[in-house]
């Protein structure tokens, strides 16, 4: 029985999940946080147990060593040979990767080369890949790209209306993100609806700290809200989403704290969205508490958030010429029934009727009334499982 580990490396973290394959059984999972900082934290969960230790972990290579030591220390594996595959989540695959890829030196170089498209994510992914290759050089190593699912978009969708030389010379175009999540929940939606994915029109809404909406036609992404980078689209936890680009030079010229375009983009990525408008938090739970206390900034942040998501869903209903189902997933999508209710309330013209008894915290599946023309589903995402499946698929080749 082989084991496959799915890795999601951040700039100072390494999240992992160990599977028995092909049974798709989760054996253990964990996260290593504060890599490169004092008092790093390694957390392992297995057999209804939880182990946490405080260490000083200087880099991703040491983090991988700690991870593997934890697996043997707790008896989760007897030796490293039980792990036959590792899959790495990579945010940006650019135009190099239309599907998951077996790792070699060239693939690692290309992942690093694409760091400009995902500066917070790709360098960390490359560090995680290099660490596993150094410690376990003989296992099957696979990169799974967030952008790959969106490579089915057509030029009229992914090109920006700017001179084409910026695409031909610099590959400036829409790439999208969260593709692994969008693909997974679309597949699960088809199962729940009892229909082939190849005949469905779906709108998938990944609503977490990052937010992206995708139009899925017969199993393929035909449009998505994130763009050249994951900054585009609806309002997010700390990201602005779409804004007028002329705002950037205007702020550089008028605000002494924003010295250049990079400073503005940093502000748009890390200090905007729910956090920026509310002035207090990027967490929807805090925003909803502000609604209860009638905090005007929380009310405004919430209303902007709902408005932006609603507009993208409406846009994709037009692109698809209607939809069979709308799927909510990720942190807020799965756990914020008020948000779902208020987004769908503005779409009742399309014949969508929520069932208030089903649209509650902790309920998954169809949350509409039986006669709703468009179904609304809440489906927990599982990007790690998709990564493990791709490792198994490529191992078999």
Swiss-Prot record:
Site (Transition state stabilizer) residue list: 178, 239
Binding-site positions, ATP: 15, 206-210, 283-285, 331-335
Reaction(s) catalysed (UniProt annotation): acetate + ATP = acetyl phosphate + ADP
Record-listed E.C. numbers: 2.7.2.1
Keyword set, alphabetical order: ATP-binding, Cytoplasm, Kinase, Magnesium, Metal-binding, Nucleotide-binding, Transferase
Pathway stated in the Swiss-Prot or TrEMBL entry: Metabolic intermediate biosynthesis; acetyl-CoA biosynthesis; acetyl-CoA from acetate: step 1/2
Subcellular location: Cytoplasm
GO annotation (BP), single: acetate metabolic process
Entry keyword Magnesium: yes
InterPro entries: Ac/propionate_kinase, Aliphatic_acid_kin_short-chain, Aliphatic_acid_kinase_CS, ATPase_NBD
Name of the top EC class for this enzyme: transferase
Binding site residues for substrate: 89
Binding site residues for Mg(2+): 8, 383
Location, primary (coarse class): cytoplasm
A molecular-function term among this protein's GO annotations: ATP binding
Catalytic residues (positions): 146 (proton donor/acceptor)
Source taxon at top rank: Bacteria
Gene Ontology CC annotation, any one: cytoplasm
Cofactor list: Mg(2+); Mn(2+)
Co-factor binding details: Mg(2+). Can also accept Mn(2+).
Similarity-based family: Belongs to the acetokinase family.
Function according to Swiss-Prot or TrEMBL: Catalyzes the formation of acetyl phosphate from acetate and ATP. Can also catalyze the reverse reaction.
Name this polypeptide is given: Acetate kinase
Name of the gene encoding the protein in the UniProt record: ackA
